[in-house]
Structures are given as structure tokens and as C-alpha cells.
């Protein structure tokens, strides 16, 4: 890292230009300020001082009267002489032309502090206060002006001791721009650093007024003057060490690199490494940062190597790795885990170490199954540890879990499909797909999904078996069957199971048809507005049907020997008993059903036209009619998106 001498020269020139401009500005500002201060302070301060002196004189006169009356016996001629000196001194102060010191108005019982003038030296110093103690030779009574000038004790070698005078007029006018610029660029020195200089001996004056030149400027001037440095001298020591400093910096960087390399080598060469203290040094080449963060007391490593100086730091391989996997850790979320990473790097870097790769591989086999796409779901079903060669058990557990968590009737099938779409498992063959019971018409969305030889067929067929599992599990509770059967019908499909409950549902519909038709003439005293011809009025058809009534009626039908899972079409009964004096469960014709519009709820809106038309392919009509039609479009969209994925 070398420095161009041209750049150094250019920098010097720029600094010279800047300092000269600053010097000119400070020259003009300081001269203007000094003139203004001299003009204003001579006029205003003398007026203020005269007013304040008059007040003080009145107070002191009253004070003298009190003192003379109280302590007339103890008064001595020395004290009277001191009082006379004080009065004479006040007049002298007011007559001095360049005096800018404010006389502070004090209480009657306060002791006067000595007033220090601003001494001017040959260098034009403005002497600031450095400590609060009054000088040694000043007494309680303020001496005269001559006594005050001589009371500033200065060492013999002081440059200002020979030329100290009582006149302070030349103080501000002798401000040199060199000193101002030097003060501007010089580091701020505090009063302790000024301890040995001749400027630090005088005592602190009383409070200064606003009309006086700023005490900060005077203080800075004094600091700069105590160690005089001109502007030209100031630049050169700053610019001189640039080139050697650059070389030193580069040397420091190289030394730091060498030391860091030596430290790393020493850390790797240690015989055994504890997991908490130095796990980063050993495990850095094997595990990623996520795993390193989760390393705690669960990982214990012993380092295997032939000669520590011959093996680079990244090639050291721990031969025993014990990993405790939690569900929240990144290992359980399919990132491969510690052992998978260890296997990969061991295969790459263990060629020089005999036996190391076999040990790592063995550890992988023992601790975790090989990470596959199923690792995501293993964390959810931790009570059933699943290997990759057991897809049947895994599939059934996922379907069972997803189905058991569904409690809402209306959203059951859709949420089950969501849970199962993300599950990668074995694709069943064509023979494994259960055949739909309700006919083979193209309108049935599940039938299309089953016959399509893609993974979409697998997902929806699993959904079908889900419904059958729910039916067979709750075989004894007919109300639960009713809820399960309504779940697929609300999304536009039927449970296509080869088991008996769905067939019994089909047969029960044929068995229920004559009972409903027989109940119509057997109740002549009906209170409902029955239309001749076995049809309901439009008001009844449009009336909302409560879900509890459907459940009660299906319970009644199940009690009479049928195992129905489909709600009665168009039923508006409030009491399920056939032949009662309440509203008859008369089937609704297709005309009135469509005239009723969308005010009918889901079970009645999905009903078929009449009871006579309720044949085997009535299921297809039920699935596509009424409210279930938009749900079918959802299945079509799902099929379309999955077809894009898998083809």
C-alpha cells in the first residue's frame, strides 16, 4: 500500500487554500467584533457600572452605619483605611477607558471577591480563568489596580511576566489570525494539560457581561498561545507520517491474518474438542449454520485424524454424532439434518482417513431415517416412526389424522383434500381405485378423477376412502352417518365406496319412496296449504329448512330399518312421524324447486325433481344440481392445476 506523492502535494495545496480562506474570514470577523465590542463596551459598560456602583455605594453606606453602630468598639483605623481604599478603587475602575469587567451587584452581607484585570502580554494573550481559588496575595479587601497587577504571581521564565501591564485595551485588538487558525485546527486541551504553562496561574475573575468579548474565544486563544504553533508548522506533522502509516497498517493486517491462521490451526490440533467451547472450529466444515445454532449439549464429538498438522481445518470429521431432533428444528422441516450433511461431506473429504466414512454412514443409519420428502410429515406423526419403505401405514395414518381433525360439516371434504394434497406417497394402480357406486356418468366429478391415471386420481380416491372410513367407524350412530354423507354432497360429490353403507343408502331411498307417497293421503287433516296433485305451495317450498329437522327425520328413517345417509329431498317437516297432522314430507316438483330460487338451503336445493325420478343416476343430478354447481367448478380447477403439475 504505497502513497502517490502527487496526491500528497495536492492535499497539501488544498489544505493551504482552505486555511488561508479560513484565516481571511477569521481576520475580518475578529477585527469587526473587536471594534464593535470596544465601542459598545466602553459606552454601555461604563453606564451600567456607574448605575451599579451607585447602588453599591448606597448599600455600603447603610452597611457602614450598621457596622459602626454595632461594632464601634472593635473598629480600628486599619479597617477604615480599607473602606476608604474600596471607595477610591471604585472610582478608578469607572475612569479606566478600556475596562470591560462587570462589577457584580452583591447583597449587603456578602464579601467582595477580588476583581482581576485581563493582562496583556507581548503575544497578545487574553488570560482566562483556570481555577476558582483567588491568588495568594489578594486579601478580602480588594487592593488597588497597581496591587492587582503585581498580585499575579508568575514564574521567572514566563514570557509574559516582563511585559504585564495594567492596560487591557490592547487585549482584543492584538488577536492574531494565526492563533485563531491554530486554535481552530488544534485539538482541544483541557485545563489539566495547561497545568505547567504560565497561563494557568491567574485566578478566576467574576461573572462577565454579554457586552464583553466571548470568554470562550479568549479561553481558546489562551490555550493556543500557551503552546504557540503557527499554521505552517501545524500542517507538516500531520502530513508527514502518511506513507509510513500506510505501510504500518498493511503490516498489521498481515500480522493479524497470520495470528488468526495460527489460532485456527491450534484449535483444530487439540486432541479432543468439547461441543460447547470449540464446536465451531471443528464442525464448521461439516454442518451448516442452522445446525450449528441448534448444537447444544446434545452433540458430543471426538476428533479423528492421523496428524493434526497435516489435516486442514475443514477436513476434520467427527466419527460419533448424536443428534436430538425437535419438531421446531430445521432438521425436522426437511433440510436433511446433521447426519445427512455429515454423510455428504464425509464422502467428499474422508479419503485420507481410513474408516471415518464408514463410521459416519453407520451413525446415519442408526440415528435417523434417510431424509426424504416425507420428513415434513414425520414431525407431525412422531408417535409412528415411519421409514420410506412403509407407504401403506404412513398413508393410512395421514388420512386418519386429517379426517379426525375435521369437525365442521360444510367444510369437511375440502379441508381433507388440502391436507392430503401435500402428502407424497405411493400412487395406487388402476385396480386399487375404488369404483364409484352411483353410476358412471361423466357428470360425476369423482368418477372423472378416479379414471384419470394421474396423481390427481390418487388424491381424490383417498378422499373417497376417507368418507368410507368415517362411515364405517361411526356405523352405529345414524346421525353421524347423516353428517358424513352431507359433507361430500355439499361439495358436489358422493362417497364412492364399495362398502355396504352407501348401497344401503341407495336402497333406502327406494324403500322410503312409497312411505312418503302413502303418508300424503293418510293425513287428510293437514294444516299445511297443500296443493292438489301432491305439490307444495311456493311459500312452503321457499321456506328455509332447519338442519335439525333433517337430522331428526333421518334418525326416524334409520329407526324404521333403513340406513339412509341422504336427507329427504324437499322435506320441510318439523315432526318426522308419517301421517301426523303436521306438514307432510311431500316431494317438490322440479318446476317449483327452480321457482323457489336460491332461498332454499343446501339439502333441499340439491334434491332431485320428484320422488319417482329418484333413480340410480339421480345421484349425478344431486351432485350437479342447485347449490353444488359452483363446487364442481372448484374440482375442475383443482384437476386442471394438478394436471399442469404432473404432466
Swiss-Prot record:
Q: Which residues carry this modification: Phosphothreonine?
A: 168, 491
Lineage here is:
Eukaryota, Fungi, Dikarya, Ascomycota, Taphrinomycotina
Compositional bias (Polar residues): 29-46, 92-103, 146-155, 193-215, 390-406, 413-432, 488-508, 561-589
Basic residues bias spans: 49-67, 633-647
Where Phosphoserine occurs, the residues are 162, 165, 197, 200, 396, 489-490, 515, 519, 523
Q: What is this protein called?
A: Meiotically up-regulated protein C8C9.04
**Where does this protein come from, organism-wise?**
Schizosaccharomyces pombe (strain 972 / ATCC 24843) (Fission yeast)
Record's compositionally biased regions (Basic and acidic residues): 232-241
Q: Where is this region: Disordered?
A: 1-241, 387-647
Gene Ontology terms describing biological process:
meiotic cell cycle
Cellular component annotations (GO), alphabetically ordered: cell division site; cell periphery; plasma membrane
Q: Where is the composition biased (Low complexity)?
A: 134-145, 156-177, 518-530, 596-613
Q: Which domain of life is it from?
A: Eukaryota
Role noted for this protein: Has a role in meiosis and sporulation.
Keyword terms: Meiosis, Phosphoprotein
